[in-house]
Amino acid sequence: MGRYVIRRLLQMIPVFIGSTFLIFVMVYALGDPVAALFGDRAPDPATAARIRAELYLDQPLWKQYLHYMGQIFRGDFGTAFNGQPVLELMSTAFPVTLRLTLVAVVIEVIIGIVLGVVSGLRRGRAVDTGLLFLTLIVISVPTFVTGYLLQFLFGVKWGLVRPSVSTDATFEELLLPGVVLALVSLAYVTRLTRTSIAENVRGDYVRTAIAKGLPRRRVIVRHLLRNSLIPVVTFIGTDIGALMGGAIVTERIFNIHGVGFQLYQGILRNNSPTVVGFVTILVIVFLLANLIVDLLYAVLDPRIRYA
């Protein structure tokens, strides 16, 4: 297991370099950051040249990337155009988004798996058909429509929750945004669990467990569910990074100053250091989540062994 982890970590290095370089090129290809810094006013040529030199923008792109990677390994993600260190922005944005993501993941895991098990065990019945139809609707409706609708109903019309999240962003305030963020993923988890349960319920090991007289709950939890969760774990593992990076719409609706908010502001103002820095961390989150998912396979299925 230890050698497998080391091998996977080494394999992450070229993936990390390739993905961050691609992001770096795409972000800096959007336009001149110095021109975006001055807005509609044309900068003085001498001032523009000085700023480009300070930001290392007067060098070829590959040299800029090497300079940026050197900064990262020193724990320096650069400085935003407003003079604030990107690391300082991360220290305020990531904790909020992590809490929001945690709420969303808990909701999609608990509710999604429970609904998937119920649907899979009752395949072809009214409950199964109803859940499939409901999840299809959830997947089809855009997140911003669901977000504004739930915000209006629960926050404005009924007054059950705050319409927007305060700067403290407590778990209680993040409950409704977490539901909005988790809804589409919850629908996919429900469908994945349902399909996996429906396929494995006919397996020989399930029939053997039932023939031995084991309680129905034990057969479902210890045998059927454990073997059916591998595709679900794969989806959830990759979905964690997607939720963190894809929270832009949800954070905009509920005025949450997290990663999505900072990315939106960075893209809007062509603030390249902010965008590249935040996306770099999201790449690391994706890679680590995939590694954890692979390790969980061996826990869920004893037949899987890593040399």
Each language-model region and where it sits:
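Membrane-water interface segments at the C-terminal ends of transmembrane alpha-helices
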Residues: 21-29, 66, 70, 133-162, ...
